[in-house]
Amino acid sequence: MKNKMKTRSGAAKRFKKTANGFKRKQAFKSHILTKKSPKRIRQLRGLKLVHKSDEAAVRRMCPYI
């Protein structure tokens, strides 16, 4: 029997597969928000797609999602 690839559990929690690629959360939004402007905090809301150049790395880390 062949070996199975392991999923990086930390990456599996951070990325979700969609039809257009992988969804990810914006960085720099979890703490030390007092020095960041409301405009900057507002723009960090929501989900973004992983860049095309990083998709292969995410796919290797999460082969089954």
UniProtKB/Swiss-Prot annotation:
Residue span of the signal peptide, if any?
Answer: none
Single Gene Ontology BP annotation: translation
* Annotated keywords: Ribonucleoprotein, Ribosomal protein
Q: Name one Pfam family in it.
A: Ribosomal_L35p
Q: Which GO terms describe its cellular component?
A: cytosolic large ribosomal subunit
Q: GO terms for molecular function, please?
A: structural constituent of ribosome
Q: Does this entry carry the keyword Ribosomal protein?
A: yes
Top-level taxon of the source organism? Bacteria
Q: Which InterPro entries match?
A: Ribosomal_bL35 (IPR001706), Ribosomal_bL35-like (IPR021137), Ribosomal_bL35_CS (IPR018265), Ribosomal_bL35_sf (IPR037229)
Alphabetized HAMAP family for the sequence: Ribosomal_bL35
Q: Which family does it belong to?
A: Belongs to the bacterial ribosomal protein bL35 family.
Q: By what name is this protein known?
A: Large ribosomal subunit protein bL35
Q: Which gene encodes it?
A: rpmI
